[in-house]
């Protein structure tokens, strides 16, 4: 009986840990990777690509700084050059204020031509912009 209980608890722990990760997928619904609750970004093969820290710092798997996400939605590269912004309504713009696309509240990612290019289910819109539009990973 104890053995079954332990196995059941382990199963729930595993399901719970996977459930905390948010997925991002391409237009064909193929999983590109996940963003874990602590900001760790992994590809579809579960290889660690890097991490987005609470202060907005983006680092690769070797802990090299790739850029930052500022509180106002400004995305900067490792040299502190402004790459673009993500507004509170999900509109993504480049450094020249040209519209790149949108990230809707349901996680749908659309390019400037309103074509669906992927999804980021449960992923913070700023993180999704880094992953889909600014290619910092």
Feature-to-residue mapping (PLM):
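Long terminal segments
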Residues: 2-32, 36-49, 54-59, 64-66, ...
């Amino acid at each position: 009986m104890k053995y079954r209980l332990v196995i059941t608890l382990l199963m729930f722990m595993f399901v719970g840990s996977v459930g905390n990760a948010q997925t991002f997928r391409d237009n064909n619904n193929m999983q590109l990777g996940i963003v874990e609750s602590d900001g760790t970004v992994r590809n579809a093969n579960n290889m660690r690509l890097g991490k987005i820290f609470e202060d907005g710092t983006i680092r690769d798997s070797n802990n090299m700084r790739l850029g930052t996400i500022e509180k106002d939605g400004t995305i900067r590269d490792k040299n502190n050059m402004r790459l673009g912004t993500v507004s509170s309504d999900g509109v993504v713009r480049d450094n020249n204020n040209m519209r790149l696309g949108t990230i809707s509240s349901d996680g749908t990612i659309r390019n400037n031509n309103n074509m669906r290019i992927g999804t980021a289910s449960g992923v913070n819109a700023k993180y999704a912009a880094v992953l889909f539009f600014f290619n910092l990973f």
